C-alpha cells in the first residue's frame, strides 16, 4: 500500500471514530484528507471500499498491539491481563473516554447492515476472545 493511501486510511479512521461511518460524508473525507474526488476514486471505488480498508487497518493495528504485543508474549497470565487492560484504558483516555472503542463502535454501527463488515469485525472479536481464554487457561 502506498503512503498516500495509508495516510487517507489513518485520517478517515479518526473521522469514523469521532463521527461514525454513516455520519461521515464524502465531502468531509475529501476536506480532511486534502484530496479531490477524482483522487479519492482513483484509490477507492466507493466509501464502502474505504470503510473496509479502515476496518482492516484498525484490526491490524489492534492485532499487533493486543495479540502480538501482549497476549502472544511469554509473560505470566496476570501480567498479560494487566497489560491488555492498560492498553485498552490508554486508548480510551486518549479521547477522555468520549469516543469508545474504534472497532467496537464500527461493530455496533455496521454489523446489522453489512455482512462483510460484520464478518470482519466478528472475526476480530472472536480471535480476541480465544486469546484471552487461552491466557486464562494457562
Question: Predicted segment positions?
Answer:
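A general structural signal for well-ordered alpha-helical segments in protein cores
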Residues: 26, 47, 51, 81, ...
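Generic hydrophobic, amphipathic alpha-helix propensity
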Residues: 4-12, 29, 54-58, 62, ...
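Short coil/turn segments at alpha/beta junctions that flank glycine-rich nucleotide-binding fingerprints
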Residues: 18-22, 73, 99
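Hydrophobic alpha-helical bundle segments that form small-molecule/ligand-binding pockets
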Residues: 113-115, 125-138
